[in-house]
Amino acid sequence: QTWPPVEGRPSCKRCGACTRMWPPEANRCVCDDIVPQCHEGCSKCEKVDTRSGKPLYQCQSFEYYNCAA
């Protein structure tokens, strides 16, 4: 099993559901961040309705992230 280096992963302030693998670097997570644009490797990018009317998105697929929390 190989996974991308932590340094090259997109950062995520709030990781939601994650797989439970060992070591921790092997885990993929769903990022709960709402962002202006999904990162390049996101395979399921969903538009989020906001009060401001600005188009914002959330990546809803399990991906490799650099999780802050």
UniProtKB/Swiss-Prot annotation:
Protein origin, superkingdom: Eukaryota
Keyword Disulfide bond: yes
Transmembrane segments: none
UniProt site positions, description: Reactive bond for trypsin: 20-21
SS bond partners: 12-31, 18-29, 38-45, 42-59
Family annotation (InterPro entries): Bowman-Birk_prot_inh (IPR035995), Prot_inh_BBI (IPR000877)
Pfam families in alphabetical order: Bowman-Birk_leg (PF00228)
Coiled coil start-end: none
GO CC annotations on file: extracellular region
Protein keywords: Disulfide bond, Protease inhibitor, Serine protease inhibitor
Listed SUPFAM superfamilies: Bowman-Birk inhibitor, BBI
Physiological role: Serine protease inhibitor.
Entry's family note: Belongs to the Bowman-Birk serine protease inhibitor family.
Protein name (database record): Bowman-Birk type proteinase inhibitor A2
